[in-house]
Amino acid sequence: MRSCTVSTMPRMICRNADLEFDWLQPCFYPDEDDFYFSGPNSTPPGEDIWKKFELLPTPPLSPSCAFLELSTEPSDWASEMMLTEADLWGNPDEEDVFGPGGLGSLTPNPVILRDCMWSGFSAREKLERAMSEKMQHGHEPAATGPATQVPGAGAASTAGRGHSGTAGAALPAELAHPAAECVDPAVVFLLPVSKRNPVPVRVAPARAPARAPAVGAAVARAAAPASAAVAAPPGLSSRPPNGGDHKVLSTSGEDALSDEVDEEEDEEEEIDVVTVEKSCKTGGTTFTLTVSPKNTALGLRREQSRELILQRSVPIYQQHNYAAPSPYVENEDAPPQKKIKREVSPHPLKSVIHPKGKSFSPRKSDSEDSVRRRNHNILERQRRNDLRSSFTTLRDHVPELVKNEKAAKVVILKKACEYVHYLQAKEHQLLMEKEKLQARQQQLLKIIELAWTF
């Protein structure tokens, strides 16, 4: 909770020097603490950047590098990251804010020149990076003392809304002194370290100690909404300065999002095959599968295991051994069936006594099969005899094959067909002659009748 009520109106600024730039926070961050860490579907800070600026006017153009040559006195992080109220809201009465007097406090490599939208990706990320670098660089003087406030803070902010010359002179006087008392970043930034590579940023060296506790309090309030939603990691270390170049690990919500995704994947239903029982039987194999779902949302179904019994027939492949005896006849002394057929007498009334042998079927069924087979053979023989006699009779009626006793059946059929066609033609011819003769007979009968009348 903020100690000072801050208004979002352009002209309303808190008179406290520690909270002078607190009114800039609603421009970039919502009041909700869990905006970026509300859930796995929340968008990163860089994707909804245009939604943050839809209520703000068009930002002023970045100043040219020509004004940097006139800078004689370097400024600290506040002049690089923040603008005055008149610059932010575009006061038409102060169009010369970016004059030599207003930009005299910028460093040779300000952050605002590298990002014309002030914080194109994330304003808080750059603010935290700049503050951590300032604090790490401030460990070299290592001067500790009580917190002091500059009495001209309110006057400087009030003068910034007046004339441009006064604003350009008062703002560097207030913010030109870097931090004298440094704060450990592990205490201020209670956020998990991101997996992204750090970005090197050059920061101007500190010259005069001042306002360390005030700066630390402002940064702590800026990082408070995010640290309330995410727990602090057990170990958070910062890298020492190396040749004036400082690398700071930026914080983000990637770790929190990945943890939530892993928890959702663990909650999904998993089906494990608990037991697989394979029992080999004669001509078949039985597989027993026990399926147990793992999900707390299923309730009573989780305790009840489902057993699926899949039973399928496995064919038995055996290689035929031609030298082995027949599996259907156990008695080796029993003669094959061909010998039985040969022993059948051509006479239909003669009975044949089959040799006694062991078989899988009963004796009654064997006798019935033999009787049926014998009757079938007799009927087949009679049919063949009748067919042979029919061909012989047909051959005798064909004049060309009367004397040919060895004529084939095909020849007999062919010659018989030709002879039938010949007989049909002859019959038709005889019928025509008969009709002519009948007509001639009628004429002769009429002549006889006329002769008898005269």
Curated annotation (Swiss-Prot):
Chain intervals for the UniProt region annotation (Disordered): 133-166, 231-270, 326-374
Name used for this protein in its record: N-myc 2 proto-oncogene protein
Superkingdom of source: Eukaryota
Keywords per UniProt: DNA-binding, Nucleus, Proto-oncogene
Compositionally biased tracts (Basic and acidic residues): 363-374
Localization terms from the record: Nucleus
Signal peptide coordinates: none
bHLH domain boundaries: 371-423
Keyword Nucleus: yes
GO cellular component term of the entry, any: nucleus
Biased composition (Acidic residues): 256-270
Quaternary state and interactors: Efficient DNA binding requires dimerization with another bHLH protein.
SUPFAM superfamilies: HLH, helix-loop-helix DNA-binding domain
Short name of one Pfam family: Myc_N
One MF annotation (Gene Ontology) recorded for this entry: protein dimerization activity
Region ranges (Leucine-zipper): 423-444
